């Protein structure tokens, strides 16, 4: 019998996350993005067709729609919060323990990007201090989740990531149930908005999601 995350059990009103719910949420976010493009793009195209001299105005209007799409992905990228450079002794100790937890294969990626890679049934996860990114099998779509460690404000960054990583390992679907989704979309959209330092982690997670395995 699989372990159930206590936080997920305490929220019975939330439908438990799984393959079906992730696909459904992905479609909803896709339709939402298409709706934004249509809402801003169609009037802009119509205005340019009616009055070609109004093309600059149409371009500005369309630019607002593109900005909304970027803001969506930026929100997802900003919610994860990679580990920074460990300077205090407690931070270095926590980061060392986290390195032991993730194992040899992911330790170097953690040091370089500040994100911990974890393979799962639902895809490849990247865990940060305040959230996680799920790269779905195939590597084309991501789901970004915001979740924090309860009363973890005083914990070193490495400990916060370790708490989330252990919760993810205990109950992957429960973790996705408890966490709040703040973005879902194409992997490249998230990559554009991520800090340059963290981008290699997303590429590695995408490669992992394509090869499968745990």
Cite the ranges covered by each PLM segment.
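Hydrophobic alpha-helical transmembrane segments
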Residues: 45-61
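N-terminal topogenic membrane-targeting module
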Residues: 6-9, 63-123
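Short polybasic amphipathic segments
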Residues: 115-117, 124, 131-137
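Canonical alpha-helical transmembrane segments of integral membrane proteins
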Residues: 25-49
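Cytosolic juxtamembrane N-terminal segments of multi-pass membrane proteins
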Residues: 1-27
